[in-house]
A protein has these predicted regions:
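Conserved "landmark" site that anchors the functional core of diverse proteins
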Residues: 1-275
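Single conserved hydrophobic/aromatic residue that forms the stacking wall/gate
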Residues: 273-283
Length: 283
C-alpha cells in the first residue's frame, strides 16, 4: 500500500477559512459542545465525492472570500458551494469538478458574488487535522479542532494524506448541485412551542407569509432574521423569565427557528447552549 502526503502552504487565508468535517462533533451538545461542521453540508459532501473522498473527510470551508493555496506536491482538488472565481496559476477553472493541481501550483479561490456565502475546497485524501471528541471540525469559540482551534492564517502549513484510490472521482452533475439564490423558500414544521400558549394564530400566519431578511449580525452560531415582531399569546415567560419568549431549557437542533426575545434565529452548527426560547422546526 502506497501512502502519499501533499503539503500545502496558505499564501492568503481569506476572510474566514476553517477546517471542517461532516457530520462534525456528534453527541456532546448536552455538555455544551456543539457539532460544528459545514454550514452547507451538501456542497461540502459533494466536494468530497468529486475527489473520491468519503463524505466525512475534512476539507476547507471558505466564507465570503477564499484562500490562495500553494501545493508542494501534485494533488486533486474540487471547489464547490457558492459561485466564486477559481484559478490555478491564474487560469480560470470550473467548480464542481475534480481538478489536478501540479506540484508548485497555486489554487486561488476569490470572493463570492451575489449568490451564496460559503465555498468548499476538498483535497483528495482529506485535510489532515487532529481529531478532538471524534471530529476534526474547527470550533473557534472553544479553540479546538481544525488548525489549532482557529481560522487559517497567512503562512499556515497544511497537509493531505492520500491512500490508494478506492473511490471514483467524478464531476458533480448540475441537477445534483444545490440551487443558489437570493430568495429561499424554507419548509417549516410547527414545533411544540408554536402552540397557542406561546404564539397567537396571527403570529403563525406571519411566520408563513413573511419574506424575512437576513440580519448582518449572523454567523455560524445562527442566522438572524428581520421581520414582524410577534404579538405573543402571553405577557411573560412565567418562572422562566420576564419576556414571553422565555422558556425552561429545552433540546433543539441545527436549523430550528428560535425566537430569542422578538428576534427569530435559524440555529447554526456552532451554537453553544441549550436555548431557553420557543422554536419551530425548519428544513
Amino acid at each position: 500500500m502506497t501512502i502519499t502526503s501533499t503539503a500545502i502552504t496558505v499564501l492568503r487565508a481569506g476572510a474566514l477559512t476553517t477546517i471542517q468535517d461532516w457530520p462534525g462533533r456528534i453527541g456532546y451538545w448536552k455538555v455544551g459542545v456543539p457539532p460544528s461542521g459545514p454550514m452547507d453540508d451538501l456542497s461540502f459532501r459533494l466536494a468530497n465525492i468529486a475527489v473520491g473522498n468519503p463524505a466525512s473527510a475534512a476539507g476547507l470551508e471558505v466564507t465570503m472570500a477564499g484562500p490562495a493555496l500553494r501545493f508542494d506536491d501534485t494533488a486533486v482538488v474540487a471547489v464547490t458551494g457558492a459561485p466564486a472565481p477559481v484559478t490555478i496559476d491564474g487560469k480560470p477553472v470550473p467548480q464542481w469538478v475534480p481538478l489536478t493541481v501540479d506540484a508548485g501550483s497555486v489554487l486561488d479561490v476569490g470572493a463570492v458574488g451575489s449568490l451564496g456565502m460559503r465555498v468548499y475546497v476538498a483535497v483528495a485524501g482529506g485535510i489532515d487535522a487532529e481529531e478532538y471528541l471524534g471530529s476534526r471540525s474547527t470550533f473557534t469559540m472553544g479553540r479546538f479542532g481544525g488548525k489549532d482551534g482557529r481560522r487559517l492564517e497567512d503562512g499556515d502549513r497544511l497537509s493531505a494524506t492520500s491512500l490508494p484510490e478506492v473511490r471514483t472521482r467524478r464531476r458533480i452533475l448540475f441537477d445534483e448541485q444545490p440551487a443558489f439564490s437570493n430568495a429561499w423558500q424554507l419548509g417549516v414544521t410547527v414545533g411544540p412551542h408554536g402552540a397557542p400558549e406561546f404564539f397567537t394564530p396571527e403570529d403563525i400566519d406571519d411566520l408563513f407569509a413573511t419574506a424575512y431578511e437576513v440580519h448582518f449580525n449572523s454567523d455560524r452560531t445562527g442566522v438572524r432574521l428581520i421581520g414582524p415582531q410577534p404579538r405573543w399569546a402571553r405577557t411573560d415567560g412565567g418562572e422562566a423569565g420576564l419576556h414571553p419568549s422565555n422558556i425552561h431549557d429545552n433540546a433543539y437542533s441545527v436549523g430550528a427557528l428560535d425566537f430569542t426575545g422578538d428576534t427569530p434565529i435559524l440555529l447554526g452548527p456552532c451554537l453553544l447552549y441549550t436555548s431557553p426560547s420557543p422554536r419551530d422546526r425548519t428544513r
